[in-house]
Each structure stands twice: as structure tokens, then as C-alpha cells.
């Protein structure tokens, strides 16, 4: 029986997600044994600065992809939102999991909702996408950067000068947390999620036909179509972690509906559009073209220049 080595980041969430995928493959009857190999990524190592300052793309996946290409592992489980828009040659996404709740959530002291937070409240996030949209909605809030895994951030909320933190609903759900810690679910019109948020990507080598065959059975077609639209938009906009870019698509009766957003880090400049169509990639490209024409592309170039990228 073939042994499949599965690459994963070391965080509790990453390992939980990896074990979930392995379990699903076992349930499907995949004729493999599995072994998890923990890999430390650049994004895990550099914790004292924001992701936008770490720079580059694929901060949480690059080292794992190197292992895949070198044959050190056979597949890898990622949060789809960590995946760069373009994969290295020789690698493919073999499966996209059914999407969990894609929304961002607020966890606050005193269980206050976003609209109830007093002016000047300090919000912890490590994401420019979240901070830009929060500031656009509530310019009177103060953003303070926070890094680390979910456990670390929840501990920092209790012990440090934060009134609330923003996290992904899906990550909390996978860790077994829900309404017991969540104070407010942020609606999409307040905070558009990251591209791929709530879904998992299982990456493998393009030429591994046997593994790909089993991964295809794990694939959720509806989620995959939605994510393809989001990633096509992301690819056209060419933004890494340095620019607030968001995209969320839903598929209903064969039609893809994509909400796409590009903003300035301070939230004062924002471009947002809803595009629908049958072809996911075409919808993503169309959204990018519309926003670019409105001024989003120029904004991205300006932000990159300011950050010295």
C-alpha cells in the first residue's frame, strides 16, 4: 500500500485541517496510508511585523511547495486564502473542499457587536483587507496589528490592549469554536472575505495521476467554481498581501456571482463591483477589468510603490 506524506504547517488549525482531509480520503476508501510532515513557512517564522511588511507572495505555502516539487511530500493541505493566484509549474490543486462559512467575525470584550463598539475602540487584525474595510465602515476605530495563531490571538485579546479582534469564521469552526466566542458575524456588505476564505486547497504534483484520481472525489464542484472566479480576479489584480483585495463568489443554478473589492490600506479609497456570469474565469477577469478602469489598478501600483515592493 502506498504511503502518502502530507505536508502541513505546524499550527493547531493547519494540523486539524490536514487531519480532516486525510480522514475524508480514508472514508472514500483511498488505498493509502498517510503520514503528516510539519513544515515551517516564512509567514510562521516572521511574527513581529505585519504580513504586508514581510513581503512576497505565498508566505504560508512556498516552503511547502518546495517540498512537493522535491518529492519530500506527496500532497499538502492549505487554507485556500493563503494560496497565490499562480501555482508553480508542476503543481496543481487536486481538490477544493466544501466551503465553510466565509465570513469574518468579531470577537470582542463584553461581547459587543461591531456597531456597538465605542469610538476609539482598538481592533486587532493582521490583514490589510480587514483593516481597510473596517476603517471604511467605522473610521473612528483604531487598528492595532496582531499576529499568531487563533489561540495566541484569543489570549492576546484577554491580556493586551485590544477591545476586539477579527478572525475567519471558518477557522474558529474547524477548531470547534462558534457562538460561544463570536460576538458578531460581519456581513459581506461590511467586510468582503479574502479570496478562497472558508475553503481548503489540497495541492499535489501534476503528474501524480493515482493521487489526483482520489482527490477529484473529494473535490466540491460548487466551491471550486466559486473559487476559480475569485482567483481569476486575484490573478488579474496581481496583489500579494500588500494590498487590500477581497473577492467572494457564490454559485446558484449555474450562475457565478462575484463581489470583488480593492481598497487603499486606510479604507478611504475603495472600488467594489458585483459581476455575474456562467464562466468563473471570465467573471473574475471582467471584475478585474471593471475595477481597474475605475482606478483600482493605479491604486495597487501606488500602494506597492509606497511599500517599496
From Swiss-Prot:
Its EC number is 2.5.1.61. Pathway: Porphyrin-containing compound metabolism; protoporphyrin-IX biosynthesis; coproporphyrinogen-III from 5-aminolevulinate: step 2/4. Binds 1 dipyrromethane group covalently. Its cofactor is dipyrromethane. Belongs to the HMBS family. InterPro entries: HemC, Porphobilin_deaminase_cofac_BS, Porphobilin_deaminase_N, Porphobilinogen_deaminase_C, Porphobilinogen_deaminase_C_sf. GO terms for biological process: protoporphyrinogen IX biosynthetic process. GO terms for cellular component: cytoplasm. It catalyses: 4 porphobilinogen + H2O = hydroxymethylbilane + 4 NH4(+). Transmembrane segments: none annotated. The porphobilinogen subunits are added to the dipyrromethane group. Keywords: Porphyrin biosynthesis, Transferase. One of its GO terms (molecular function) is hydroxymethylbilane synthase activity. Monomer. It is an enzyme of class 2 (transferase). Tetrapolymerization of the monopyrrole PBG into the hydroxymethylbilane pre-uroporphyrinogen in several discrete steps. This is Porphobilinogen deaminase. The lineage of its organism: Bacteria, Bacillati, Bacillota, Bacilli, Bacillales. The modification S-(dipyrrolylmethanemethyl)cysteine is found at residue 241.
